[in-house]
Amino acid sequence: MTDVLEELSGIIAQRLREMPEGSYTASLAKKGKGYVARKVGEEAVEVVVASLSEGRERVVSETADLIYHLLVLLAMEGISLDEVRDELRRRMK
């Protein structure tokens, strides 16, 4: 899964740099960090709702949405996956 996350993070970073027309990532960035942060919250709630009443496939789908929007927010903050990985390792000690 890490390879997929790193690949997706790279694509997100590129879209944020280039801001191509028609890019969903670019459209999120244009709406600002506050909007993206709210999307992360919305997607987190959707994961919770799915886990309580909508079944496994829906949980997987909503989790993918959550991870994508979280990666966009992290990129907008200039936070790398390596930084998050390091923090998780620190917490495992």
Swiss-Prot record:
It is an enzyme of class 3 (hydrolase). Belongs to the PRA-PH family. This is Phosphoribosyl-ATP pyrophosphatase. GO terms for cellular component: cytoplasm. It is found in: Cytoplasm. GO terms for molecular function: ATP binding; phosphoribosyl-ATP diphosphatase activity. PANTHER family: HISTIDINE BIOSYNTHESIS BIFUNCTIONAL PROTEIN, HISTIDINE BIOSYNTHESIS BIFUNCTIONAL PROTEIN HIS7. It catalyses: 1-(5-phospho-beta-D-ribosyl)-ATP + H2O = 1-(5-phospho-beta-D-ribosyl)-5'-AMP + diphosphate + H(+). GO terms for biological process: L-histidine biosynthetic process. The keyword Lipoprotein does not apply. InterPro entries: HisE, PRib-ATP_PPHydrolase-like. Pathway: Amino-acid biosynthesis; L-histidine biosynthesis; L-histidine from 5-phospho-alpha-D-ribose 1-diphosphate: step 2/9. Keywords: Amino-acid biosynthesis, ATP-binding, Cytoplasm, Histidine biosynthesis, Hydrolase, Nucleotide-binding. Pfam families: PRA-PH (PF01503).
